[in-house]
């Protein structure tokens, strides 16, 4: 079936569901709760587990004081925590600012200065470069959260 043929059908629950990233993860957790969502090395997370972890991150950010429109930056490789940030940060109402792990500390500092990040999430493996970047930023009130990629919670 081509897209043109598909588009001729009236939109109904059976053939159409508008999806934003947040409604996508919520729907996936309901429809496919036990199906794998993330496979990372030996670790595997179902859609339900990913959704639950995403809610925990959003809740933690909100309790910390992050509000709609605030910026949360993250310096991380493609890990499960990065996936959680892609859903959890917008779920809290904040804007996610992902920073390329190949950048030098001066450039990371520049990005942090111009993003006005309130929180900076950093993979522990990248902490030395992040520490150098933090020394260059004007906003000394930024909260830095370090995590390990193999953390279970």
Regions found by a protein language model. Give the residues of each.
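Flexible, non-catalytic linker and terminal segments flanking ANL/adenylate-forming cores
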Residues: 1-18
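Conserved adenylation A10 loop of the ANL superfamily
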Residues: 33, 148, 152
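Short, flexible active-site loop motifs that bind/organize anionic cofactors or intermediates
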Residues: 11-15, 40, 47, 98, ...
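Conserved AMP-binding/adenylate-forming core of the ANL superfamily
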Residues: 16-17, 22, 26, 34-79, ...
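Residues within well-formed alpha-helices
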Residues: 27, 53, 72, 84-88, ...
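Structural core segment of the AMP-binding/adenylate-forming
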Residues: 63-64, 91-149
